[in-house]
Amino acid sequence: MSIYTLLFLLSYDKEEINYEIKEYPKVSIIVPAYNEGKNIKNTLERLIDLEYPKDKLEIIVVDDGSKDNTYEIAKEYEEKYNFIKVYKKENGGKSSALNYGISRSSGEIIVTLDADSIPEKDSLIKMLKYMYYYNADIVVPAIQTINTKKLIEKYQYIDYAIHNFSGIVIDKMNSVFIASGPFSVFKRSVFEKIGLFDEKNISEDMEIALRAQKNNFKIKFCPEVIIKTVPPDNFKSLLKQRVRWTLGFIDNYTKYRDIENIYLREIVFGINIILYVLLPLSFLIILYMHGKQLYDFLKYLSSINYDIYYFIKNSFSFDINTYIFQLLSTSQLILITFSIILLINFLLFISIYKRYDKSKSWLSIIYYSVIYLFFSIYFNAIFIIVAIYYKLFGRNLRWGGIVWNNSLINKLLNRKYG
């Protein structure tokens, strides 16, 4: 996040929405679930506890061909509560499950909720007030992770927080381009006009938001509502998630790059494209320089027959210093420059975040920020590089029930043999 963005956010205060809902609308909450036996119970308990008239609430769980006990657990709740409906279908992916649920819903308001995400009791009321106050068609919440025990989870905690603050700025430009899975609120009229979720798109939440933007629907980001979600707890799962997000952005950017919203087209898309170029490029430059300098250093050791005694004895000589300090030269300068920029950003970020989240101590926020500072450049560069590789050479990649085959090599082969 850039310095000018954070300076802008320093002046941001939570906006109190003084709006009374005179008549509560019928709300249908669609919960797509695939192998969510560990999470579905907690999610349903939280939905039952929502502060909303139960005669105006409809919870629809769509089991998307789970291989665990997700369906059985959900059915137990259906038997207890008349406002819960549970369906089971063949595995077809999240979009397919969402569409299945929406087509069987009756609410004038549709809420999508990932089965591993948890709303607060007042989340729905706040989101609806936000929707009516701003006359919005879609309202998107902030998202934060539940678990922060592992380093990989602490990294994601800060990453989500940064995205939340970015959302505030993007919202000011009327350029919200993701209707995230955890508790996005839609007017039914949106789906009636532009259709349901794209079942072939691996980033359906981005695609539906961009399609709504293209059709001039108003999307608002509601930072006052923070939905908790379960993050990937290992690097392999995180890599798979972020590669999917990156491929989804590339596909959706290609599809909607001519969108009329100039702020979205030129600024939001532009910044993302620049990052997708600079991050892997910087990473590869650093990797190359480290490799070259290490090679030169090992070459020097070889020239002295790996005589460690000679090396230690002459370790302060000019020649050896040249080899040693080359390891800390240009590549480290690039890294230090990035670190200084990020450090300034995080000092500002920490001061803002404490206004926003009182649950973490100053020490925790600083600790998490240091972890993010250390990993962010490398992680994001790796995510982008792997995604670009798949975009060029990937054949048939599967995410849930969706098979992604939108790579350059597949297009060339289809053109050649199609």
Task: Describe each PLM feature range.
Residues P25-S28, E58, E207:
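Cell-envelope/extracellular polymer assembly enzymes that use nucleotide-activated donors
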Residues E45-K56:
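Short, acidic, metal-binding catalytic loop of nucleotide-sugar glycosyltransferases
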Residues L47, D64-G65, G92:
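Conserved short acidic donor-positioning loop in nucleotide-sugar-dependent glycosyltransferases
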Residues D63-E72:
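A conserved acidic beta->alpha catalytic loop
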Residues L210-I227:
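Catalytic donor-sugar/metal-binding loop of nucleotide-sugar-dependent glycosyltransferases
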